[in-house]
Amino acid sequence: MILLIILLPLVGFLLCALFSRYMGRVGSAVLTTMIMFVNVILTLILFYKVSVLRRLYFINIGTWIYSDSFQVNWSFYIDNLTITMLLVVNIVSALVHLYSTDYMSHDPHLPRFMSYLSLFTFFMLMLVTGDNFVILFLGWEGVGLCSYLLISFWYTRLQANKAAIKALVVNRVADFALTIWMVSIFFVFKSLDFHVVFPLAPFLLIPRLFFLVLIYLY
């Protein structure tokens, strides 16, 4: 169910991007919106299991990068914080899909807009469910890309293009800071996995903590 929740928006994006000419504007909008509301229902079920039944979920799909002491897995972790963010992201995204279906009903490029929304949602879900900083970084990069695509959707408007470029530049600054922070965390903990870093953080030696603070301030 967890992988289904994460991947459904990506499926909506692919269907809308590849078959919109056959489904038409209305069909593409209805399909992506229905997928998001199905995702909300699945997330509510998962929310009950995590928050009420007190279950935690860890999924490791496989190893992506492996080199000596550096290893990155395609892994996802669901706890109370994660499921709360999942619920917020999916509900807000479903409502935005629904609103856009009516608000942009007369736009000939509606399928493209809906596909961007679905892709944005997929990367956001990846960001909040990933169990390591690399997956979080990939999700962040995807969110930045989709933000650019959505802001510059009406690419013939000069102001839209300027705003999109500004958003892209701001995201690149954050990328630089996040990259330095990831390198610093690996230097201290020898791992980028959340389930390794978080339990060790309270036992961090003061000099290393000071080093991380300096990196952050820089």
Q: Which ranges hold each PLM region?
A:
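...captures the hydrophobic TM-helix bundle architecture rather than a specific catalytic motif
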Residues: 1-218
